[in-house]
């Protein structure tokens, strides 16, 4: 989003207040879009259920540099001004980010609104690398949904957390016969 913001300001097609208003309109529009009904959930029951979209602000750029920019601060302003539940927001804090960015986010957290959540980008990066992700994918990832971390554009987080309890019981009872429960042979 930042390249469009910077270009608009540079060529005069966008003013700071217009950018703020566009972001506020996005927040309102997003908040008015309930999630589609889930399996076994009617449209009426789903009317106030959201898809847990999460706006990531801050963190690192693809080259490993500080990912905070003027738009990051504007988004924090909008989060504080709008105080609506969707989209959820989070800040990625890295040792490379400027202290005023962290302090600005903490001033919003202090209000008790519950947003933005705060994630340690450096720890997320280490976890991604430990899990075998490339450095580029690790830098380009973050949190999605509630708190799941993923490499954006490379993988998906399942938010439902459904458990197949009958399958677990079947595996527990028939572990010696792995083929009978569709597991094949141990590798």
Residue ranges of predicted features:
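Conserved catalytic cores of very large enzyme subunits
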Residues: 1-187
């Amino acid at each position: 989003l930042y390249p469009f913001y910077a270009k608009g300001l540079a060529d005069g097609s966008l003013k700071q207040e217009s950018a703020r208003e566009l972001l506020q309109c996005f927040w309102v529009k997003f908040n008015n879009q309930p999630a589609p009904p889930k399996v076994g959930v009617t449209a009426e029951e789903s009317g106030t259920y959201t898809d847990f979209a999460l706006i990531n602000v801050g963190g690192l750029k693809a080259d490993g540099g500080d990912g905070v920019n003027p738009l990051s601060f504007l988004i924090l302003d909008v989060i504080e001004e709008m105080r609506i539940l969707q989209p959820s927001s989070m800040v990625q804090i890295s040792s490379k980010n400027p202290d005023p960015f962290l302090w600005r986010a903490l001033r919003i957290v202090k209000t008790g609104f519950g947003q933005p959540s705060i994630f340690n980008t450096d720890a997320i990066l280490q976890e991604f690398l430990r899990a075998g992700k490339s450095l580029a994918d690790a830098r380009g990832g973050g949190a999605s949904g509630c708190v799941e971390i993923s490499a954006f554009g490379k993988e998906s987080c399942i938010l439902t957390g459904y458990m197949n309890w009958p399958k677990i019981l079947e595996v527990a009872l028939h572990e010696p016969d792995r083929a009978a429960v569709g597991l094949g042979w141990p590798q």
